[in-house]
């Protein structure tokens, strides 16, 4: 849970926090996620894809600072993003304030630390964290999971605050006991539209069987290679050579199980220790100064 005002941002756990006084400002981490595996089973009759994915939150992410105010305003630092209803954070805040019957608003500062359109769930996490922060600031009997789903299929996962098996369109969540694991993230500077990624998959009809979740969890604990895959990786990497380069670089750095996260372009690989992760990240950044490289851990 986040510290009181003045401490470093931490993930938000709404179940353990006292309400905030109207005069208080709090800062929260909106954690990134990686998909330790992503199977796309097929296309549903409603036009969505049937997914089977292991999603894990990380200790790196965007930052949100939120305080009560007379009206709703959003400021964004670190990226050229809109600050009105075109921004998912703004829409999430507006949705909660309306559902809770709040007459006032909030001042929100979003500090973008994650690359845009990167497969790390940044926008969805920002939205979920906004919902939980406003629920702390303006407590009300609002169904947060239902509200989150109206904002995006990944948003409910970030309300959960832990690793989960995501099924359906990503909204059917089963918590998983994933150990803390050090890893390295690499984004080669490519933005990938999730819509495009799934369209390319559909063109190839490259649908996949379900993940071996038990085998994946056992391999994580034993620090073995993961029996996993990302169904989107082939179609996306075939069209974006920098993703192929990022995966090869992670493997050459001595890290295990390199994989693209979500629809890309961020790739990751697991390390045996924090020391190995940091050393590999430093080496990769030196070799590829234009890439975004981060050593981190699962939550």
UniProtKB/Swiss-Prot annotation:
- Where are the membrane-spanning stretches? none
- What EC number(s) does this enzyme carry? 2.7.1.148
Q: In which pathway does it act?
A: Isoprenoid biosynthesis; isopentenyl diphosphate biosynthesis via DXP pathway; isopentenyl diphosphate from 1-deoxy-D-xylulose 5-phosphate: step 3/6
GO molecular function ontology, one term from the record:
ATP binding
By its UniProt entry, which NCBIfam families does this protein fall under? ispE, PRK14608.1
Q: What does it catalyze?
A: 4-CDP-2-C-methyl-D-erythritol + ATP = 4-CDP-2-C-methyl-D-erythritol 2-phosphate + ADP + H(+)
Q: What name does the UniProt record give this protein? A: 4-diphosphocytidyl-2-C-methyl-D-erythritol kinase
> Which Pfam families does the record match to this protein?
GHMP_kinases_C, GHMP_kinases_N
Arranged from A to Z, the UniProt key words for this protein are: ATP-binding, Isoprene biosynthesis, Kinase, Nucleotide-binding, Transferase
The cross-references to SUPFAM superfamilies, in alphabetical order and at most eight, read:
GHMP Kinase, C-terminal domain (SSF55060), Ribosomal protein S5 domain 2-like (SSF54211)
Q: Which GO terms describe its biological process?
A: isopentenyl diphosphate biosynthetic process, methylerythritol 4-phosphate pathway; terpenoid biosynthetic process
Task: Quote the function comment for this protein.
Answer: Catalyzes the phosphorylation of the position 2 hydroxy group of 4-diphosphocytidyl-2C-methyl-D-erythritol.
* Assigned protein family: Belongs to the GHMP kinase family. IspE subfamily.
Q: Which residues bind ATP?
A: 115-125
Active-site residue list? 33, 154
Question: Which InterPro entries is this protein grouped with?
Answer: GHMP_kinase_C_dom, GHMP_kinase_C_sf, GHMP_kinase_N_dom, IspE, Ribosomal_Su5_D2-typ_SF, Ribsml_uS5_D2-typ_fold_subgr
